[in-house]
Amino acid sequence: MEQAALKSSVRKEMALKTTSPVYEEFLAVTTAQNGFSVDDFSVDDLLDLSNDDVFADEETDLKAQHEMVRVSSEEPNDDGDALRRSSDFSGCDDFGSLPTSELSLPADDLANLEWLSHFVEDSFTEYSGPNLTGTPTEKPAWLTGDRKHPVTAVTEETCFKSPVPAKARSKRNRNGLKVWSLGSSSSSGPSSSGSTSSSSSGPSSPWFSGAELLEPVVTSERPPFPKKHKKRSAESVFSGELQQLQPQRKCSHCGVQKTPQWRAGPMGAKTLCNACGVRYKSGRLLPEYRPACSPTFSSELHSNHHRKVIEMRRKKEPTSDNETGLNQLVQSPQAVPSF
């Protein structure tokens, strides 16, 4: 009804406009510019609203499309809720049984839904109750490919049930080459034999059934340690013999045989000990000087202090002067003057 009223009002207004002088001037200008007459152009044809049914059909089609889109947008949510609430989670089989024509969704949406169902199922199978207790879980057939039988998780066990015993390392140097032998040597002590017997007592273990513990064996390619000690002792004996053959050195002034350094003296290089050589170099080496370690040291005749040595020499000087004066008087008599 409203559309019919609008159509009648529009027609009346257009009829009034065609009779106005402004409209006539507009038509004259357009005909002069475009080159067609007014008779060929009619306003009624332009404003012909006889195709109202076409517009009505288009509106109904648009409404139907909107409803289809709304229904299609609601259907995936319902399907997702049903998948979450279900307990068996058979995602791939359910989507395979339904034809694609029933779902009004594109191929990309279907792929996304399948991926979501696989992800949910994988997460629930990984964190399910039986898997937490340690028992193997069965996987669905679509996860194992074309296999008909379910794949069970296999727990691997090491071939060595008991730990392999190891020999304690010693702190001595191992200079010689060592070869590992498969059999136990008979020269090992009671402690080593007891340890090997206790460690290899398990006959059921396949590792120790044919071989004992590996023990190092010293080869004879390099000389053993005692030979090295013999070499050292021979060197020391040789050096001692050389020292015996050489004349033993001693100080020419005090007779000392051991000194930290030999120094030059009146007899040549390395003829005085360290103490006597220092005093000889400074000009203070006197016969009364002797170091305390000298074998010829006498406290009455010698001293190792320079002041005491000078005092001793002063005590000896007066007697010697008096004796020399008396001798001169006796030997040279006074000449008697002649009359």
UniProtKB/Swiss-Prot annotation:
One of its GO terms (biological process) is positive regulation of DNA-templated transcription. Keywords: Activator, DNA-binding, Metal-binding, Nucleus, Transcription, Transcription regulation, Zinc, Zinc-finger. Residues 181-206 have a biased composition (Low complexity). GO terms for cellular component: nucleus. GO terms for molecular function: DNA-binding transcription factor activity; transcription cis-regulatory region binding; zinc ion binding. Transcriptional activator that specifically binds 5'-GATA-3' or 5'-GAT-3' motifs within gene promoters. May be involved in the regulation of some light-responsive genes. This is GATA transcription factor 5. It comes from Arabidopsis thaliana (Mouse-ear cress).
